[in-house]
Amino acid sequence: MKLVIVSGRSGSGKSVALRVLEDLGYYCVDNLPLPLIGTLLEQLKGSNDLVAISVDVRNMPEQDKVLVKQLASLPPDTELTSFFLNSSDKILLKRYSETRRLHPLSKSQVSLQEAIKLEGKLLEPMSKLVDHYIDTSNLNIYDLSDQVRQILLGSVDKELVINFESFGFKHGMPTEADFMFDVRFLPNPHWELALRPLTGLDEPVAEFLNRQPLVNKFIWQIENLLETWLPHLERNNRSYLTVAIGCTGGQHRSVYVAEQLAKRFSNGKHKVYARHRELNNAKA
């Protein structure tokens, strides 16, 4: 089992790192007391091989010897990776002032500046024990996300899931679409009596549409558009992309185009799915 522990000063980016881990398939738990790690791993054994927890100052032991003992008591098959995120006092003070959030130690009747300094002192033992120390003072959320992915995967690229979904406009537009293309202007197999009862998944319909230069040109242009912008979407920490293709009824043209696009992009590094809303609804 792989375990990632994310610690650090409040406001340094622990939540950002945890979101990256969640996107990578980790089962994430925020602010788990260290003595409960063993119990958590035992509960998840066999069902989750990737686990990540974040630990803040409220859950840290006061002595570093206790911390070392707790980490040493992890199950022997645990592959541990640890991060400590830090920022300068000035940057942390600025971030808290901008977000107006309450610092975890502010309840002790101390000022924000004093709470930030106190937290740094309390977390110092942890900062010396971790595998990866990241100063986020000059990093934005995208830079930090890239660093975490680089450490865990050896690459800043994330696996983007692309869903090509066909639909019929007369049944309503999908609300989850990131891109939406209207193919109602393409030649319609519906007017061919032999093709009318078939769908875009059937070979006769596919052959009919494949013979249409306008159809092939449109598919090629969508493919080029997506290939141009996919790297930028990935850099923007996007995990899912839904491309909706709509025709009148969602039976012929949109199904064929969605299938063709899914085939073309399935040869790359992305996870690609084709979903046909109206066909699925007809089966239900």
From Swiss-Prot:
It comes from the Bacteria. The keyword Glycoprotein does not apply. GTP binds at D56, V57, R58, N59. GO terms for molecular function: ATP binding; GTP binding. InterPro entries: P-loop_NTPase, RapZ-like, RapZ-like_N, RapZ_C. SUPFAM superfamilies: P-loop containing nucleoside triphosphate hydrolases. Keywords: ATP-binding, GTP-binding, Nucleotide-binding. The keyword GTP-binding applies. Belongs to the RapZ-like family. Displays ATPase and GTPase activities. This is Nucleotide-binding protein Shew185_0683. It comes from Shewanella baltica (strain OS185).
